[in-house]
Amino acid sequence: MPRGDSEQVRYCARFSYLWLKFSLVIYSTVFWLIGGLVLSVGIYAEVERQKYKTLESAFLAPAIILILLGVVMFIVSFIGVLASLRDNLCLLQAFMYILGICLIIELIGGVVALIFRNQTIDFLNDNIRRGIENYYDDLDFKNIMDFVQKEFKCCGGEDYRDWSKNQYHDCRAPGPLACGVPYTCCFRNTTEVVNTMCGYKTIDKERLSVQNVIYVRGCTNAVLMWFTDNYTIMAGVLLGILLPQFLGVLLTFLYITRVEDIITEHSVTDGLLGPGTKAGVEAAGTGCCMCYPI
């Protein structure tokens, strides 16, 4: 090969290496910062929650979920940053495999949830009922439930009768809340003052007799129907979750391939090693500590 062509090939190889390195560093750094932000928000929310803590269930503590998500994102992304800066093949492979495993688990989870749709709905309804039992004791769940009921015009998990699980709304309770639902279940007229007693004495009534006073459909079905009707938003959410992970796996795979090629080319073209030691260097290039000098 003429010298000019050889130099051009080396330049193109070097350019692709630098482009992939830059892309992977930016990718990892962005998600590292996002992970740190999520972790910080989760810690702050948990500190605030501890002031009023009465429950132990992680389902009822979004702060715990944020902390776990933030820790995973922070650690995995830091591995990606370190691996891409140091060209550490072991860390690069670990980063790629972790992203790939997370992506596969999410895909399998989504498929299983669709196949066992009824069981998934029952699982959600059971968890909502457990949250309703402690509605007035856990501020996190109360805020989430109130928001969902107002925005999606629904009441309870399966239906409005789920509120009988709460000790204050149970029809056998002695207080004024007995047999009622929270005011966030009520039909609202924005021009009128909010009537917090609008849902009283409704749980023991038939659906037809209260459907003009409160929302009778459950929030689980209401949210699922909303996503079904707004499938473009649902598709966007799924792409927003899955596409970055797929992009990370692809970038890391291409970068690993390029680093391995450059390690081999560097060893051969420099003529520093004999035939007997070349294989050993190639084997070391796929190990945990071989870095290409920059």
UniProtKB/Swiss-Prot annotation:
Which UniProt keywords are given for this protein, alphabetically ordered?
Answer: Cell membrane, Disulfide bond, Endosome, Glycoprotein, Membrane, Transmembrane, Transmembrane helix
Q: Which CDD domains match?
A: penumbra_like_LEL (cd03158)
Disulfide bond entries? C154-C219, C155-C185, C171-C179, C186-C198
Residue ranges spanning the membrane: these are 24-44, 63-83, 94-114, 236-256
Q: Which residues lie on this side of the membrane: Extracellular?
A: 45-62, 115-235
Glycan attachment residues as annotated in the record: N118, N189, N230
How is it placed in the membrane, per its record?
Multi-pass membrane protein
- Predominant subcellular localization, coarse grouping: membrane
Modification after translation, per record: Palmitoylated.
- The record places the following residue ranges in the Cytoplasmic compartment, namely 1-23, 84-93, 257-294
Provide the Gene Ontology terms for cellular component: late endosome membrane; plasma membrane
**Compartments where located:** Cell membrane; Late endosome membrane
BP terms from Gene Ontology: protein maturation; regulation of membrane protein ectodomain proteolysis
Task: Give the InterPro entries listed for this entry.
Answer: Tetraspanin/Peripherin (IPR018499), Tetraspanin_animals (IPR000301), Tetraspanin_EC2_sf (IPR008952)
Q: Which family does it belong to?
A: Belongs to the tetraspanin (TM4SF) family.
Q: What does this protein do?
A: Part of TspanC8 subgroup, composed of 6 members that interact with the transmembrane metalloprotease ADAM10. This interaction is required for ADAM10 exit from the endoplasmic reticulum and for enzymatic maturation and trafficking to the cell surface as well as substrate specificity. Different TspanC8/ADAM10 complexes have distinct substrates. Promotes ADAM10-mediated cleavage of CDH2. Negatively regulates ligand-induced Notch activity probably by regulating ADAM10 activity.
- Record note on quaternary structure: Interacts with ADAM10; the interaction influences ADAM10 substrate specificity, endocytosis and turnover.
Name under which the protein is recorded: Tetraspanin-15
What species was this sequence derived from?
Bos taurus (Bovine)
